[in-house]
A protein has these predicted regions:
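Sec/Tat signal peptide C-region and signal peptidase I cleavage site
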Residues: 15-21
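Sec-dependent N-terminal signal peptides
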Residues: 4-15
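A cross-family detector of function-defining hotspots
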Residues: 31-134
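A glycine-biased structural micro-motif
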Residues: 24-25, 35
Length: 134
């Protein structure tokens, strides 16, 4: 199963397909990538809407402010750890063509323009990659 998911991720990257969300994309662009949310959120007091999507072996949460994504989280349905290649693919998808710099001795990254951070954290027993605009 891991090999199949990795193969799909690598093929999509190799053929230049846009398969991962990028911070700042509209809710329509996110829906084109992930389909209809399995849980459509409603705006909170700050106007932030959190939608939940499921695509392939991943559960994806995307937070929107004024219709544009400001944070994303990715977790595997099977609760397995992410491979380095999966992490790289998700970060690349949210790079906006800027490199990510890994923090020493941590599973955390900062985008070179200092406008986004990412980190790995276990939430509800699931390894989760979180990506957030600053």
């Amino acid at each position: 199963m891991k090999r199949t998911v990795l193969l799909i991720v690598m093929c999509c990257l190799a053929f230049g397909g846009h398969v991962f969300a990028a911070l700042g994309e509209s809710d329509d662009q996110i829906a084109e990538l992930f389909g209809k949310p399995i849980d459509q959120g409603v705006p909170d007091k700050k106007g932030i809407t959190t939608n939940v999507y499921e695509k392939g072996n991943y559960i994806i949460l995307v937070q929107f402010l004024k219709g544009y994504s400001m944070a994303e989280s990715y977790t595997r349905v099977d609760k397995q750890e992410f491979s380095d290649k999966e992490i790289s693919a998700f970060l690349e998808g949210s790079s906006n063509e800027r490199p990510w710099n890994k923090q020493p001795d941590k599973q955390a990254w900062e985008r070179s323009d200092h406008k986004a951070t990412a980190w790995l954290q276990t939430l509800s027993g699931r390894p989760t990659l979180l990506i957030q605009a600053q």
